[in-house]
Structures are given as C-alpha cells and as structure tokens.
Amino acid sequence: MRQSHQLPLVGLLLFSFIPSQLCEICEVSEENYIRLKPLLNTMIQSNYNRGTSAVNVVLSLKLVGIQIQTLMQKMIQQIKYNVKSRLSDVSSGELALIILALGVCRNAEENLIYDYHLIDKLENKFQAEIENMEAHNGTPLTNYYQLSLDVLALCLFNGNYSTAEVVNHFTPENKNYYFGSQFSVDTGAMAVLALTCVKKSLINGQIKADEGSLKNISIYTKSLVEKILSEKKENGLIGNTFSTGEAMQALFVSSDYYNENDWNCQQTLNTVLTEISQGAFSNPNAAAQVLPALMGKTFLDINKDSSCVSASGNFNISADEPITVTPPDSQSYISVNYSVRINETYFTNVTVLNGSVFLSVMEKAQKMNDTIFGFTMEERSWGPYITCIQGLCANNNDRTYWELLSGGEPLSQGAGSYVVRNGENLEVRWSKY
C-alpha cells in the first residue's frame, strides 16, 4: 500500500470539510510489472494515423513515467497537428485531454499549451457547454464526462471557471450522470476527480468561494462516491471492466467518504490484472485509461511544474523494442446476425473475418445495403462514435444516441473495440438517455 499526503489545512472552519484520513492506494508491485506488458503492447502496436487515441496514450504513459521514445515522438507529432490544424473541431473534453497530456510534468511540449493559448480556448469551450445547458434543459454540447475533464484541466492549469457554476451543475442527481436509469461510473469518477481538485484550490486559496460552496462540493463528492461504490461487483470490478480504472482513481482521492471495508482495493486490482491477461484491453484508449490506477497514479498527480519521472527501466522497455504480434487465424470467417432498430427492425446476416470488431460488421452491412444500413461516424479520443444511421442523427440536446447491443444487452465497449463472436446477435438501436 502507498501513502499520500493530506491537503494543507487553512483555518478551523475549513477543517470539517477536509478528509481526515490518509488516502490509501493499492498498486501493482514491481515484481508484477510483467503483467502490465499486454497494456503496453496494445499501445505500442496500435495505429495512430488519425491521432485520436494518441492523447490518451501520451497522458497515461507520461503520468506513470514510462518513456518509449519513438512511440512518444510519433504521438506528440499527431497532437501537434491537432493543435495547429484542427483545434476548432475538437470537443471541449478532447481539448482538456490535450492540455493534460502536454502538461503532465515539466517538458518541452508544455509550451504548446501557452503558445497556442489552449487554456483560453478551453475556457471558451467550457462556457459554450454551460450556455448550451442553460438553453437546452441542462444538456451540455458533449456530455458530463467531458464537462468534468474541462473543470479538471482548468483547475490544474489555473484557468478561469466559476465555482458557482460547478456547484450549480455538478449536483449528484443531475440527469447527465445517467444513461437511462443506469449511473455512469466513469462519468461519476471523473466528476469526483474534478470536484476534488476544485476543493483543493478552494482550501489553498487559489480560487475564492463562500463556505457554502466548499460544503456543497464535499456533499456532492460523498454522494458520487457512494454511487460509484454501489456499482461494485462481487469480483471487485466497478461498473464494468472499462470503467474500473477511473473508478479506482476516484476512490484513491476520496477515502474520507467511505469506510475501509466498503472497498477491497486489492481485489479490484487483482481482477483487473486477470482481465488484462484475458485480452480485455485490446483498445489503446482502454489500455491507457486503466494503466494510471494500476500504477497508483491519478489525474490529480499531474503537475506542470514538477520534473517528469521515469519508470521505463523497471519495465525493461527499449525504445525500439520489436513487439511480436500474434496474427489472427488465416482466412477464418465467422457469421453474425446484425440489425438496426428505429421504429421497426431491419435484419441481415454478415460474414466477417474472425477477430473483427463491431464497426467492421456495420461497414460490411453498409456495403450490402447502403439505404438500410448506411451510417456515419466521428473519430473521437475514445474511439469511433456512431453519429447517424439512415440519416437519423444522434443529438445531445435531445439526448438521443445510437446504442450498441449484443443479445439485447448494452455493450460496455465501443464499435471500434468490441470483438464480435460467431453466431452473435448484434443490434444498433435508436435510444434516449
């Protein structure tokens, strides 16, 4: 177990709102670093031509101190291209991630944040999210996961934001924490990280707010932590395999809000390691999101003024180390049932290569019948996002989206990462959240 430091205390009045116990963090021991190698292999072997996954991977590797020079150089170039050429197109959360990745620690790339006024641009994008919420019944332009990233980045990099707006919009019962009736663990976890940063800034006097704001932030954090823990499974996963890493980060920084027996950190860690060994994290975004927690790190460890640490030697990674890729079964095909459901359901049978992802099935069906199965998508930091099918497009203001299902159950992975199985019944359904 690893000990972290309590926040500085300022005044007896604030004392009652500040965590009274030290944060306990479990992390992979050095002798078990070999069990993290599949995550690193996924990040090393992935194709970053579009540059969308690069930000998550750079953030993750820098945060835990792993330097793979040739890979990092390639991904930094992709990030620089996005900053210089298409910044107006990126969402607020993507821009927040770019800032976090560039400024994890003191490094040359950090200058891009200031040379291109990224903090100012994020402030504007965040304000646009707030204005959209005010105009559209509390619905942001993107989602609350990205909104939380915005607040976190602005907080860590001394940007301007309104504490009153944070208190107003981050109430735990806000509909944006939910998809239908299901609480979103990763959204709640990112909100806990953001609120914890804001609270620390209030305590340190970096931003001004009244006593009520600090109290409300503590109340919100406690409620969100309880909701996160309510999603804990018997095997220790929290929400699902892919939300567990960020849930761990949130619980690392909020130990004052739950009892020691409410969460067995080591059990969660061991289950995630088992999931890694079974190939669960084959998507670079998923691999990047889970790695920091396994190394005992959280996004609150980001500090643009601190020296970059290096843990590469402990992993025995060479910058040019060749990675052996296991090829899929040669010319092995599978058949799946695929349907699109709007008011009625449209079916087809699709044959794809063994090892194909959901997106490949959609692309094959589109070639078979573009009228019924034609779709459009956007490449985002979290992978491909299905925007329209049959010309019917997802709309944040209406809280509509295209839901991916297998056997009638919602998937926890996206179209670009979920690997389909022979005989599977796959569905894309027009839904509201």
UniProtKB/Swiss-Prot annotation:
UniProt superkingdom: Eukaryota
Disulfide bonds listed in the record: 26-265, 105-308, 155-197, 388-393
PTM annotation, UniProt: Contains about 30% carbohydrates.
Keywords: Cobalt, Cobalt transport, Disulfide bond, Glycoprotein, Ion transport, Secreted, Signal, Transport
Chain positions recorded as cyanocob(III)alamin binding sites: 142-146, 186, 240, 289, 385-386, 402-404, 411, 433
Tissue expression from the record: Produced by the salivary glands of the oral cavity, in response to ingestion of food. Major constituent of secondary granules in neutrophils.
Region (Globular C-terminal beta domain): 333-433
Chief localisation class: secreted
Listed Gene3D superfamilies: 1.50.10.20, 2.170.130.30
GO CC terms, sorted: extracellular region; extracellular space; specific granule lumen; tertiary granule lumen
Signal peptide bounds: 1-23
GO MF annotation list: cargo receptor ligand activity; cobalamin binding; molecular sequestering activity
Glycosylated residues (UniProt): 160, 216, 316, 337, 343, 349, 354, 369
Region (Globular N-terminal alpha domain): 24-310
InterPro entries reported in the protein's UniProt record: Cbl-bd_prot, Cobalamin_Transport, Transcobalamin-like_C
Location of the protein in the cell: Secreted
A GO biological-process term: cobalt ion transport
One Pfam family linked to the record: DUF4430
Region annotation (Flexible linker) ranges: 311-332
Role summary: Binds vitamin B12 with femtomolar affinity and protects it from the acidic environment of the stomach.
Family: Belongs to the eukaryotic cobalamin transport proteins family.
Protein name: Transcobalamin-1
Source organism per UniProt: Homo sapiens
